[in-house]
Structures are given as C-alpha cells and as structure tokens.
C-alpha cells in the first residue's frame, strides 16, 4: 500500500489480504515544513468514507468517532519516504491524511481487508 503526500493520493489495490502489510509513504511536498501523518482506521457499524468526510467537513470534531478504530498512525517528515509495517484484520478501513502544519484532514479512500 502506497501513499503520495504531495498529491494526497493512495495507490494500491482496493482489496488486500489480512495480516502484515507494508505501508510506503512518499512526502515530496515542495513546502519544507510540510510533514503529514497517514491514519488508517477501521470503519465499524456499516460506516463509509462518506461518514468520515462528513465529520471532516463539519470542522467540529474534537476526538475520533467511536465507529472509527485507529489501526495505525504513520508519520512522514518532509522529503522522506518511510516504510511502516502494520497488521490488519478483515474489515473495511479508511485512509485519512493529516497535514501537520495546519491540521487539515483529507479522507482519501477505503480499503477492504479480507
């Protein structure tokens, strides 16, 4: 699974096998202090990416919703290309990016783990 922090874009399959995964990040932002975190969260109770987007759009979230179980938070410093490991159980997961300099959140996509 790969994420490009400059374009806020996930590249990879929509369905992956359960178990250990490598998460590759690429922070090629032209802004020197523009680090980000990629957050992977399991969506519970039939929630979808639209629900995540609605929380972000509301601008009032002060905590993670109970239906979004954080499975991993992966930082990428400016100009870095780190690789992280995570083990995911079956389910549907949302990928969310948070830009560190201003806290802006971007709901990117969902990935199904089988």
Please place each PLM-identified region on the residue numbering.
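Extracellular/periplasmic metallocenter environments
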Residues: 1-7, 14-18, 26-36, 66, ...
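Contiguous segments within soluble domain cores/interaction surfaces
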Residues: 20-58
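Short amphipathic beta-strand segments in non-cytosolic proteins
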Residues: 43, 61-70
């Amino acid at each position: 699974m790969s994420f490009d922090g400059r374009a806020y874009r996930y590249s990879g399959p929509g369905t992956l096998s359960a178990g250990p995964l490598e998460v590759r990040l690429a922070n090629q932002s032209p802004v020197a202090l523009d680090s980000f975190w990629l957050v992977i969260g399991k969506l519970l109770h039939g929630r979808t990416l639209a629900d995540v987007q609605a929380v972000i759009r509301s601008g009032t979230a002060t905590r993670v919703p109970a239906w979004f179980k954080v499975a991993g938070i992966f930082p990428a410093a400016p100009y870095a290309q780190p690789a992280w490991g995570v083990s995911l159980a079956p389910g549907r997961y949302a990928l969310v990016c948070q830009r560190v300099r201003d806290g802006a959140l971007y709901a990117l996509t969902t990935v199904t783990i089988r």
